[in-house]
Each structure stands twice: as structure tokens, then as C-alpha cells.
A protein has these predicted regions:
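General small-molecule cofactor/ligand-binding pocket signal
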Residues: 119-121, 177-179
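Structured loop/turn residues at beta-strand edges in well-structured enzyme cores
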Residues: 67, 89, 116, 132, ...
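Conserved SAM/SAH-binding beta-strand->alpha-helix loop
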Residues: 100
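Residues at the starts of beta-strands that form the adenosine-phosphate
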Residues: 92-93, 117, 156
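S-adenosyl-L-methionine
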Residues: 1-97, 105-106, 167, 178-208
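Short, conserved SAM-binding/catalytic segment
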Residues: 107-118
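Active-site segment flanking the S-adenosylmethionine/decSAM binding pocket
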Residues: 75-79, 121-167
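A short acidic, amphipathic alpha-helical/loop segment
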Residues: 85, 89, 109, 147-153, ...
């Protein structure tokens, strides 16, 4: 188990719950964390992100149906931290979209070390990617969420939205679930099927 100090704003109870989540985590090298059977090379920023948000990801980023053997489109893949999260929860394949060039080598090393069935896309998200074959999309890439406003349907997804105006427009257009957070909003289509726009657009990007 990894013991870390309480993060700012956490109660003692929050800290204990996070310790419970990390019961099978351990540092295997200075910058490598083992979670279950996976080993992730991380920067200090991504280690803190894993520690602070893994427990929340279970509420934000998992659909109510099984991901066993499914393909996840991970927009804003970072160093592979959310890919690890999805493999840990049964995903069979991840398409990792991460345009930040400095993260590419780290993401590739994590893929190779864990022998993940992964495709790495080192360019910015474009809504044409929604024509690819996948079962669920996670998006955390500031600014990309506005591209979803022009869609006729929204795939099964969890989208982190960084401004309220966009969150309101997406909720009005698609009638998706909204989980308000302190500084952002998590929009979810928990269905196994795309949700059609209320505006009846003929544009339809399915994720079959």
C-alpha cells in the first residue's frame, strides 16, 4: 500500500478512503507505480493525479455495464494513467489520443512494458475520430468538448467539460447525465448506445 499525506481540502475520512483504494499499489522504482498487475511510469504530476482522482474515476469514467473485452477511446490519454484504469477494469483495447509530444515517449514505454493492446494517436482530437470502432469514450481534453456540440448523436461516454456554458448546451442537446464538480462538469451517456440529439440532426457518428 502507498501511504501519502492528505491532499489539501481532504477530511481525515477522505484520506482513509483513498488509502483503501490504494491497498494494492506500490512504488517499484522512484517513478514507477504498480497497480494490480500493471506498472506505470509516471511523473510527479501524474502520480498525484492518480492518487487524487482514481476513486472519483470509478464514479465519473465507468459505464454501468461491463467493459470486459471492450474498446475505449481515451481522449486526453496523458501518460497512460486512464488507460491503466480501463485495463484494470477489464477493457480489451484502448485508443489513446494524446497530442502533447512530450508525453508520447512515456505513453509508448507504458504500452510496451505492460504489453497493452493499444493504438496511440499523437494528434489533437477531431470529431471524425468518432467514426472509429469503439464501445466507450472518455474525454478530458480542454476545448475538445465543444466539437461535440455539432454532432447528431453522442456515443457512450464520459466527458469532462471545463466551462458551464458548454456543459449546459451539451446537456440540453443530448439530455445526458451531469455530475457537477468543484471546477468542472462530468457529462455521461451511460447507455450502451449513442444518444440522439434533440435537434434531430442528420449527422450521426456511431461507435459500433
Amino acid at each position: 500500500m502507498i501511504f501519502r499525506r492528505r491532499s489539501p481540502g481532504w477530511s481525515y475520512w477522505d484520506w482513509l478512503k483513498h488509502l483503501g483504494v490504494s491497498w494494492n499499489w506500490r512504488m517499484v522504482e522512484d517513478n514507477h507505480v504498480q497497480i494490480g498487475r500493471y506498472v506505470l511510469e509516471v511523473t510527479p504530476y501524474y502520480m498525484e493525479l492518480l492518487w487524487r482522482e482514481w476513486r472519483a474515476w470509478k464514479n465519473w469514467y465507468l459505464p454501468p455495464w461491463s467493459l470486459d473485452g471492450k474498446t475505449v477511446l481515451d481522449v486526453g490519454a496523458g501518460c497512460g494513467e486512464t488507460a491503466l484504469f480501463y485495463y484494470y477494469h477489464g477493457a480489451g483495447r484502448v485508443i489513446a489520443v494524446e497530442p502533447e509530444s512530450s508525453l508520447g515517449p512515456l505513453l509508448n514505454r507504458n504500452m510496451e512494458r505492460n504489453r497493452w493492446n493499444m493504438e496511440i494517436v499523437e494528434r489533437p482530437f477531431d470529431k471524425s475520430m468518432l467514426r472509429w470502432s469503439f464501445d466507450f469514450m472518455k474525454m478530458d481534453a480542454e476545448g475538445c468538448e465543444t466539437q461535440l456540440l455539432s454532432l447528431g448523436s453522442l456515443p457512450p461516454c464520459a466527458v469532462e467539460v471545463h466551462d458551464k456554458a458548454t456543459a449546459d448546451k451539451l446537456q440540453e442537446r443530448f439530455e445526458v447525465e451531469v455530475l457537477p464538480q468543484k471546477e468542472n462538469w462530468i457529462l455521461r451517456n451511460p447507455s450502451e448506445h449513442p444518444v440522439i440529439s434533440n435537434e434531430g440532426s442528420n449527422t450521426n457518428h456511431n461507435s459500433s
